[in-house]
């Protein structure tokens, strides 16, 4: 939600939430293509890693259940402090699957995917295809790479019901554009003593 929220200028509405069933179909198609290219069986595996803030279980529960319902495994970890991020767990999972000999390719989606660069480079050096999916605005390190395939989430068919309103000060159209407020003006009244 953070990367998408930064693009939208606020919390995503239902129309702008990514559809994980579409991402799942895309992963299956990629695994099929990789199977065809290598002549071996490549089975897609999808895992999502998330932190759960104290008292936040009810907020993430519907999302986690929806992910599990479409075939994604979910690793959930309590967010107890700034150092309790899930990136080390993601890296450990990638390394474990590689050590088990079942990793035939890797697709990484992360708002902070640059944390995976060293592992990605090692896998690429071994000949494994690596794709990073995310948003161009937040993954310049992957977009600029000669060895990583980058796919913008909006380029995956069916992920978003509507095109994202990707307007920023860095990419203004010639005719100009309205930048929507991050919150309603009435939020200024919240917390005021009446």
Give the role of each language-model region.
Residues 1-84, 129:
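Domain-level signal for Mg2+-assisted phosphodiester chemistry and nucleotide/NA-binding surfaces
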Residues 58-192:
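Nuclease catalytic cores that cleave nucleic-acid phosphodiester bonds
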């Amino acid at each position: 939600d953070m990367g998408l929220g930064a693009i939208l200028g606020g919390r995503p509405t239902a129309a702008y939430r990514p559809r994980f069933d579409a991402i799942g179909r895309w992963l299956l198609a990629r695994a099929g293509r990789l199977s065809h290219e290598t002549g071996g069986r490549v089975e897609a595996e999808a895992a999502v890693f998330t932190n759960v803030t104290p008292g936040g279980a009810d907020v993430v529960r519907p999302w986690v259940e929806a992910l599990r319902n479409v075939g994604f495994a979910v690793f959930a970890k309590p967010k107890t402090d700034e150092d309790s991020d899930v990136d080390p767990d993601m890296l450990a999972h990638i390394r474990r699957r590689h050590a088990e000999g079942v990793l035939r390719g890797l697709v990484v989606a992360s708002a902070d995917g640059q944390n995976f660069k060293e592992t990605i480079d090692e896998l690429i050096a071994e000949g494994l295809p690596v794709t990073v999916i995310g948003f161009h605005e937040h993954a310049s390190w992957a977009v600029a790479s000669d060895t990583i395939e980058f796919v913008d989430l909006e380029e995956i068919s069916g992920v978003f019901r509507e095109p994202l309103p990707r307007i920023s000060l860095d990419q203004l159209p010639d005719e100009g554009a309205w930048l929507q407020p991050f919150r309603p003006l009435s939020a200024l009244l919240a917390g005021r003593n009446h």
